[in-house]
Amino acid sequence: MEEGVSIYLVSDSNVDTAENIASIAAAHFDTFIEKIKKYPYVGDKNQIEEIIMEAANDANSIIIHTMVVPELKDYLLKKAQKFGIKIVDVMGPVINAIEDSTGISPHTNLAKNNKEDYLKKIEVIEFAVKYDDGKDAMGILLADVVVIGVSRTSKTPLCMYLAHKYIKAANLPLVPEIEPPQELFEINPKKIFGLTIDPEVLVKIRKERLKSLGLDANAIYATEERVKKEIKYAEEVMKRLGCTVIDVTNKAVEETANVILNVLKGGEIS
């Protein structure tokens, strides 16, 4: 019997290009494609680690990516090779072929044609990476938008999505045992967006994450009691801040981002 294939689509932007190519290829082997998983707006090495661990658990997996940020792209390749996972760079060969044929550096070409737009995009993406997961409280003061919430509410991919909309976004995890930094209470609450989620849904998400990492799915991190405690604490912090709260239960990253963009324009949560 033929062995099934699991396809992982990975990008630091949307996965449309990778998905289109994968779909065309899969049409020739549709009876042997076990699953196709999408990972858009990948913004840090931890996300890459999770993707790699999940792909490594599949007997026959392929990663198709359109990563642009050099540091993350190289890290993805390195990790995939370490675990013997097949990896396809969709954009790289095309860009390299054009560069070889024309003698024009892709970076120079982009900068020449649209320097201001290109540099701004790189700046906000690097900002999202630098101030991800509360790494530096200074990001709270510098950001256009600050996203807060408990673990596994898609804060990082949301900030990467906003970066592609030219918005400097920082994010901060809320944990009962750790008091939020004072900087969070010093900025305009209109810049802060709190993410909440249905406890049962979050329990399932966390259990799946633990499984993908080869850890015990029944760890305290994924228990109903712990999840409810964290969500209650997070919502109390959001109330203290007086910030906008968004329920991300069963919401795609794009949907949550559109809510934020609408609020920033003076609209309301729909």
From Swiss-Prot:
<dbReference type="GO" id="GO:0016776">
    <property type="term" value="F:phosphotransferase activity, phosphate group as acceptor"/>
</dbReference>
<dbReference type="GO" id="GO:0043531">
    <property type="term" value="F:ADP binding"/>
</dbReference>
<dbReference type="InterPro" id="IPR026565">
    <property type="entry name" value="PPDK_reg"/>
</dbReference>
<keyword id="KW-0723">Serine/threonine-protein kinase</keyword>
<dbReference type="GO" id="GO:0005524">
    <property type="term" value="F:ATP binding"/>
</dbReference>
<dbReference type="InterPro" id="IPR005177">
    <property type="entry name" value="Kinase-pyrophosphorylase"/>
</dbReference>
<keyword id="KW-0418">Kinase</keyword>
<feature type="binding site">
    <location>
        <begin position="149"/>
        <end position="156"/>
    </location>
    <ligand>
        <name>ADP</name>
    </ligand>
</feature>
<comment type="similarity">
    <text>Belongs to the pyruvate, phosphate/water dikinase regulatory protein family. PDRP subfamily.</text>
</comment>
<protein>
    <recommendedName>
        <fullName>Putative pyruvate, phosphate dikinase regulatory protein</fullName>
        <ecNumber>2.7.11.32</ecNumber>
        <ecNumber>2.7.4.27</ecNumber>
    </recommendedName>
</protein>
<dbReference type="Pfam" id="PF03618">
    <property type="entry name" value="Kinase-PPPase"/>
</dbReference>
<keyword id="KW-0547">Nucleotide-binding</keyword>
<comment type="function">
    <text>Bifunctional serine/threonine kinase and phosphorylase involved in the regulation of the pyruvate, phosphate dikinase (PPDK) by catalyzing its phosphorylation/dephosphorylation.</text>
</comment>
<keyword id="KW-0808">Transferase</keyword>
<dbReference type="GO" id="GO:0004674">
    <property type="term" value="F:protein serine/threonine kinase activity"/>
</dbReference>
